[in-house]
Amino acid sequence: MARKRGGSSKKQKKVSFDYGVVHIKSTFNNTIITLTDKDGNTLTWASGGTVGFEGTRKGTPYAAQLAADKVAREALRMGIKKVDVLVKGPGPGREPAIRTLQGAGLEINQIKDVTPIPFNGCRPKKRRRV
């Protein structure tokens, strides 16, 4: 079998920003955290699944905390110090993710809730009866 040549397979992005935008999409099943530049180009991302959780554990606050820590470490490595945070969704990972970003050393300029709310749009699914 042929040996693999060259370095690691993961590309290292050469970025020299000092400002970024963190998008936190928090659902009841998972939390996805994406770091972008101000134009919206993705620099790095993490979720409950990428930090090692499976199934229902992806939606826990602890999984969101670990994902946020991973993104924050990568942002600091790239030289990003200041971020805006855009939060979308009602999940349990919203608050722990923001707290972890702050605790990791990122300076948060603003926190904005961008959860889409319909102005009487489509008919919702039927109510869940337990």
UniProtKB/Swiss-Prot annotation:
PROSITE patterns: RIBOSOMAL_S11. Disulfide bonds: none annotated. One of its GO terms (biological process) is translation. The keyword Transport does not apply. It holds the Pfam family Ribosomal_S11. One of its GO terms (molecular function) is structural constituent of ribosome. Keywords: Ribonucleoprotein, Ribosomal protein, RNA-binding, rRNA-binding. One of its GO terms (cellular component) is cytosolic small ribosomal subunit. Part of the 30S ribosomal subunit. Interacts with proteins S7 and S18. Binds to IF-3. Belongs to the universal ribosomal protein uS11 family. Located on the platform of the 30S subunit, it bridges several disparate RNA helices of the 16S rRNA. Forms part of the Shine-Dalgarno cleft in the 70S ribosome. This is Small ribosomal subunit protein uS11. It comes from Thermotoga maritima (strain ATCC 43589 / DSM 3109 / JCM 10099 / NBRC 100826 / MSB8).
